[in-house]
UniProtKB/Swiss-Prot annotation:
Keyword check for Ribonucleoprotein: yes
Any one GO cellular component localisation term in the record: ribonucleoprotein complex
GO BP terms in the entry: ribosomal large subunit assembly; translation
SUPFAM superfamilies: Ribosomal protein L20
Keyword vocabulary terms for this entry: Ribonucleoprotein, Ribosomal protein, RNA-binding, rRNA-binding
Family classification: Belongs to the bacterial ribosomal protein bL20 family.
Domain of life: Bacteria
Organism this protein belongs to: Chlorobium phaeobacteroides (strain BS1)
UniProt xrefs under HAMAP family: Ribosomal_bL20 (MF_00382)
Its job: Binds directly to 23S ribosomal RNA and is necessary for the in vitro assembly process of the 50S ribosomal subunit. It is not involved in the protein synthesizing functions of that subunit.
Entry protein name: Large ribosomal subunit protein bL20
Length: 115
C-alpha cells in the first residue's frame, strides 16, 4: 500500500507561506525554503517592533512636550514635576497632542502647573 502524505495539507501549508512572502524581493517570494526563512524573520521583526513602537511613540511625545515647554520658558522635566505636584493628570500622548494642535491651551496648562 502506498504511503499517504496528505498532499492537501502540505499544499495548503506551502501556499500559506508563499502568500505571506508575496511581494518579497527575488527568490524570497517564490522559492519555498527561502521564503520560509524570510517569513520567519519578518515575523520576528514584527513581534519585536510592536514593542519598540510603544517606546518610539513615548519618546516622540516627550520631544514634542519638551519643545513646547521650552517655548513657554521651562523644560520637560520641570513641567512634569510641577504637574505631578499640582496633581494635573494628563498623559503624555494627550499633552503632546495639545502642544501641537492648541499651543494656547498648552500655555495655560504650563501656567497652572508652574504658577
Amino acid at each position: 500500500m502506498p504511503r499517504a502524505t496528505n498532499s492537501v495539507a502540505s499544499r495548503a501549508r506551502r501556499k500559506r507561506i508563499l502568500k505571506k512572502a508575496k511581494g518579497y524581493w527575488g527568490s524570497r517570494g517564490t522559492i519555498l525554503t527561502v521564503a520560509k526563512h524570510a517569513v520567519d524573520k519578518a515575523e520576528q521583526y514584527a513581534y519585536r517592533d510592536r514593542r519598540v513602537k510603544k517606546r518610539t511613540f513615548r519618546s516622540l511625545w516627550i520631544m514634542r512636550i519638551n519643545a513646547a515647554a521650552r517655548e513657554n520658558g521651562t523644560s520637560y522635566s520641570r513641567l512634569m514635576e510641577a504637574m505631578n505636584k499640582k496633581s494635573i493628570d494628563i498623559n503624555r500622548k494627550a499633552l503632546a497632542e495639545i502642544a501641537v494642535k492648541d499651543p494656547a491651551a498648552f500655555s495655560q496648562i504650563v501656567k497652572s502647573a508652574m504658577g
